[in-house]
Amino acid sequence: MLPTARKLVFSEVPIVDLGPAWRDDAGRAEVADAIAAAAGTVGFFYVRNHGLAEQDVRDIFQTAVDFHSLPLEAKMEVSLKLNDHAQGYLHGMTKGNDANIKENLQEAFQIRRPLADDDPDLLAGKPLHGRIPWPSAMPDLKPRMMAYYDKINGLGYRLLELFELSLGLAAGTLKASFAKDMNSLRLLHYPPQRPDESGEHLGARGHTDTNAFTILAQDANGGLEVRNRDGEWVAVPPVEGTLVVNVGEVLKVWTDGVFTSAVHRVINRSGNERYSIPFFMYPSFDAWIQPLIRNPDPANVAPEDLPTSFPRDRPFVYGELKARNVARIMPQKSVA
């Protein structure tokens, strides 16, 4: 059920227990209501009893540590600068074609849903469709990442069903836009920053996510912050046994702004190396995105003042906007 009253000034991020959703229909309805309340006020929420084993989460963090411990030349072998589909290694302090974007203090390795060798979109060179570049120096990276990918992807689709229920939509309504999803897994590493860092140098600058929603595993170091309507940065500290879910621009459009895609950032003041593992639920490239419900309170929508904001006043092909956004923020292979 959609939230009837929304207070976009918040001081903490709520926790949603998914356990009842795996029990029966009444539990699913209870959880869907809790998700709607969190998505319509904060745009961020923790989930517990999510179904991923603690060992699976520990394993993917160790995978991230092992990859980012490789020599730089081994990582640069799979630099996303060497391809035009934005998969591979993103070196810290690099950026895309927008001169106004400042560098982030991070490095990452990212993949999307693997494509078959005879995939027609891959063979046609369709934007954002390409083979994953795996580093030769870490031959077990592929099986380790794919083991986690398959499990977190399953959770993503279970959450998608709960979002459908929370909006009163028929089962499969949102899933139809994921017929050939571009879901993405990223291994992020943030070097330590000064404890008194005020915001000039950031691990990740304030942004919204250009997907449906994100499922984040974060380590014990903290640093993630979400901005409320008063412009205050609210900490999203690690909570044992939970994952963090945040609403992206696509869900904001689908709900006509009822669900809020909150601006968030990362400042690693811990003094330690910080790792986080986001999983992005991306619709199919060719999915048409437009509001699926009407906002009963259109005046109570967060301002759309970021380059990452998606339009709600006209339908659009998801992949076209996503490809333009990727070109803005990420380095890509030079085209003569």
What are these regions (language model features)?
Residues 1-336:
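Peripheral, non-catalytic segments flanking oxidoreductase cores
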